[in-house]
């Protein structure tokens, strides 16, 4: 009995020692491959402070971690950092470390990331960093892809604490996403799978033509998506969506084509109180929102159907909000706002964004008894 325990202890000790030593043996080889493949594929500057391999972090998978990774453009974008990440972690098959047939990547995790996407006034984006290969045929391109030592067979993709800025100077659109956390799981290596997605951003600001549509909005979503990866069509199944205090569901589908994105989506809200509508106003949502007293009825509907092509063509959309005989008051104030009646609608028949119409009729209220 004692002899068996001793042998087991020795075996475990040897195994742990190997798990500590082996990463050092493979680190130089994999670091060289990462830099070689990066230079082969990217027309950009990139580097990282260190590359580490661990057999513990995602056991029984091996983990490759790039610390302080950054990617910067060239030419006009050479001073603009596209991506800066504290850590980029890839989980690979452990046995692939001992062969030359490549490394199967089943999980990617990105932590503490800043992403700055820019579209110049002439339409050039700073994320167009892949080297062109205009001389290759489709068959040659497939062979080149197959020859890559890294095989993407993702089962899990994780984002932790990402800050993202999208600055479209041609389309006059701007988005600022703060503290985005997201998890996506599913068999991304198959033609069809069910993706399980959960994401939340602490603060989203969105402007179009200088007009703020969202300001520091808190957004959360959890959904199952029927993903037809062979045809790039994604159909929403069970899902929940929250925008500040408004909870809703989204029905429909999105299909990625080239260059269009086809869609048919509808926002479903079972019941929306006036207080939930007020959560869309940043100054109200940020100050004593829980103690705010409200009354009245409200409805919110939204739908979008058609094709979006770049910044020039938008799908048909219709967003409508109605408030009837509503009121709100802070407990600390002597008077509130009552007899609030609003009907607002934003519509576009599809096509140019300039065809968008905004109609607000009526918009009336009383403040401390005064209309």
Where do the PLM segments sit?
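Amphipathic hydrophobic-ligand
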Residues: 41-49, 76-92, 105, 170-183, ...
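Outer-membrane beta-barrel translocator/pore domains, especially the C-terminal barrels
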Residues: 109, 116, 262-279, 295, ...
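Elongated, acidic membrane-bridging lipid-handling scaffolds
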Residues: 113, 133-233
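Transmembrane beta-strand segments that form the barrel wall of outer-membrane beta-barrel proteins
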Residues: 164, 232-240, 357-363
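N-terminal type II signal-anchor transmembrane helix
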Residues: 1-45
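Flexible beta-edge/linker motif
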Residues: 52-124, 143-167, 185-200, 261-266, ...
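Flexible, solvent-exposed coil segments and beta strand-coil junctions
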Residues: 68, 160-163, 202-204, 229-233, ...
């Amino acid at each position: 009995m004692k002899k068996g325990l001793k042998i087991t202890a020795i075996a475990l000790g040897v195994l742990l020692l190997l798990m500590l030593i082996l990463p050092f043996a493979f680190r130089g080889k994999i670091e060289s491959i990462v830099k070689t493949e990066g230079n082969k594929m990217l027309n950009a500057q990139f580097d990282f402070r260190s590359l580490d391999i661990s057999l513990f972090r995602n056991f029984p998978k091996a983990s490759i971690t790039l610390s302080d990774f950054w990617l910067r453009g060239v030419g006009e974008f050479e001073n603009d950092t596209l991506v800066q990440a504290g850590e980029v972690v890839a989980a690979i098959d452990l046995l692939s470390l001992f062969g030359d047939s490549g490394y199967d990547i089943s999980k990617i995790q990105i932590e503490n990331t800043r992403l700055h996407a820019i579209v110049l006034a002439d339409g050039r984006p700073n994320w167009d960093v892949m080297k062109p290969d205009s001389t290759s045929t489709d068959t040659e391109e497939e062979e080149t892809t197959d020859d890559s030592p890294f095989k993407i067979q993702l089962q899990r993709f994780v984002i932790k604490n990402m800050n993202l800025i999208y600055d479209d100077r041609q389309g006059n659109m701007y988005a600022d996403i703060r503290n985005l956390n997201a998890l996506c799981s599913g068999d991304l290596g198959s033609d069809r799978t069910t993706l399980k997605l959960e994401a939340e951003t602490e603060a989203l600001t969105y402007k179009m033509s200088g007009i703020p549509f969202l300001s520091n909005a808190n957004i959360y979503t959890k959904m199952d998506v029927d993903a037809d990866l062979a045809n790039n069509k994604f159909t929403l199944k069970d899902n929940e969506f929250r925008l500040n205090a408004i909870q809703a569901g989204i029905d429909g589908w999105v299909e990625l084509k080239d260059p269009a994105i086809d869609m048919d989506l509808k926002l479903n809200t079972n019941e929306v109180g006036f207080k939930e509508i007020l959560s869309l106003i940043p100054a109200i949502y940020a100050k004593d929102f829980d103690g705010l007293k409200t009354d009245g009825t409200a409805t919110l509907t939204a739908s979008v159907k058609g094709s979006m092509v770049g910044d020039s063509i938008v799908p048909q959309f219709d967003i409508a909000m109605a408030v009837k005989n509503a009121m709100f008051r802070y407990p600390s104030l002597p008077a509130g706002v009552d007899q609030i009646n609003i009907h607002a609608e934003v519509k576009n028949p599809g096509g140019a964004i300039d065809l968008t119409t905004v109609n607000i009729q009526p918009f009336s209220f009383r403040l401390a008894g005064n209309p």
